Swiss-Prot record:
PANTHER family: TRANSCRIPTION ELONGATION FACTOR A PROTEIN 3, TRANSCRIPTION FACTOR S-II ZINC FINGER DOMAIN-CONTAINING PROTEIN. This is Transcription elongation factor A protein 3. Residues 86-110, 120-132 have a biased composition (Basic and acidic residues). Residues 187-303 form the TFIIS central domain. It comes from Homo sapiens. The keyword Transferase does not apply. Disulfide bonds: none annotated. Keywords: DNA-binding, Metal-binding, Nucleus, Phosphoprotein, Transcription, Transcription regulation, Zinc, Zinc-finger. Its main location: nucleus. GO terms for molecular function: DNA binding; zinc ion binding. InterPro entries: TF_IIS-typ, TFIIS/CRSP70_N_sub, TFIIS/LEDGF_dom_sf, TFIIS_cen_dom, TFIIS_cen_dom_sf, TFIIS_N, TFSII, Znf_TFIIS.
Length: 348
């Protein structure tokens, strides 16, 4: 068995341990990884860093967590070490690093090597662009502009790689998630980012002193552990949490979540009725009571008359009752039932 196949096998075992929340035997696997001669290509193709980072986040064994941190630190050093110090490629890499630093949040430092695969994918494109630009410079003066446009397109498309988080749609969250909150699934990472933006819908989240990214990650993890997939049911569940947390007419829900009065596990399972504001609950209750009162109107004991014409069947075979639904000085409400088609209506 080749080294790459062995790493893939270990990564799969670690992911299963995290999914089952049983990390027994993880220490032996991490020791095997520690003795392996790792390369950048193996880190990229096997994505072993993501699996080890998952164990680090979910394992309670201090020895396992410590060894996982050592592995991640060593691999990150390996990923950061190569790079051309001079020339055109060196300048382009420095520009890319400056752009990435501008996107980073001020309150976290990257721990796992999750972003370097994106850099390596950009390197072949950069090489091709530089070679093409050199060859085109000797052939005709018009070609360099075309190559520059192609290079700009490749740079614009680079954020779409699987290793980079999707751009959030909310203007209130402009920074990317910290690597420790990434799941390796682009759909889940996007949902965590949107939940975090919903928790930051108002500046008062700073008063609670909570890490919104961490809280959003916990909410998403509870939803995912319950549904076990990222299908439409999962997305609808996340979407309903976001809309209710961002509702300006229901600020109490978001504040209760930020303060801890509503836990991440509870908000992940609450129904739309449970998340609704007090005003909306009262309105729904009033509508329910009105509907019950209308449908509980007795069919027997009413007065049969031909004074009312049904709007559906146009017949005049009806039964009506008069009930005092409002205050005593208000007129009574007349409830009419068509004996032919069962149509009901009321008027005052």
């Amino acid at each position: 068995m080749g080294q790459e196949e062995e790493l893939l096998r270990i990564a799969k075992k670690l992911e299963k341990m995290v999914a089952r929340k049983n990390t027994e035997g993880a220490l032996d696997l991490l020791k095997k990884l520690h003795s392996c001669q790792m390369s950048i290509q193996l880190l990229q193709t096997t994505r072993i860093g993501v699996a080890v980072n998952g164990v680090r986040k979910h394992c309670s064994d201090k020895e396992v967590v410590s060894l996982a941190k050592v592995l991640i630190k060593n691999w990150k050093r390996l990923l950061d070490s190569p790079g051309p110090p001079k020339g055109e490629k060196g300048e382009e890499r420095e520009k890319a690093k400056k752009k990435e630093k501008g996107l980073e949040c001020s309150d976290w430092k990257p721990e796992a090597g999750l972003s370097p695969p994106r850099k390596k994918r950009e390197d072949p494109k950069t090489r091709r662009d530089s070679v093409d630009s050199k060859s085109s410079a000797s052939s005709s003066p018009k070609r360099p502009s075309v190559e520059r446009s192609n290079s700009s397109k490749s740079k614009a498309e680079s954020p779409k790689t699987p290793s980079s988080p999707l751009t959030p749609t909310f203007a209130s969250s402009m920074c990317l998630l910290a690597p420790c909150y990434l799941t390796g699934d682009s759909v889940r990472d996007k949902c965590v980012e949107m939940l975090s933006a919903a928790l930051k819908a108002d500046d008062d989240y700073k008063d609670y002193g909570v890490n919104c990214d961490k809280m959003a990650s916990e909410i998403e993890d509870h939803i995912y552990q319950e549904l076990k997939s990222t299908d439409m049911k999962y997305r609808n569940r996340v979407r309903s949490r976001i809309s209710n947390l961002k509702d300006p007419r229901n600020p109490g829900l978001r504040r209760n979540v930020l303060s801890g009065a509503i836990s991440a596990g509870l908000i992940a399972k609450m129904t739309a009725e449970e998340m609704a504001s007090d005003e909306l609950r009262e309105l729904r209750n009033a509508m329910t009571q009105e509907a019950i009162r209308e449908h509980q109107m007795a069919k027997t004991g009413g007065t049969t008359t031909d004074l009312f014409q049904c709007s559906k069947c146009k017949k005049k075979n009806c039964t009506y009752n008069q009930v005092q639904t409002r205050s005593a000085d208000e007129p009574m409400t007349t409830f009419v039932l068509c004996n032919e088609c069962g149509n009901r209506w009321k008027f005052c």
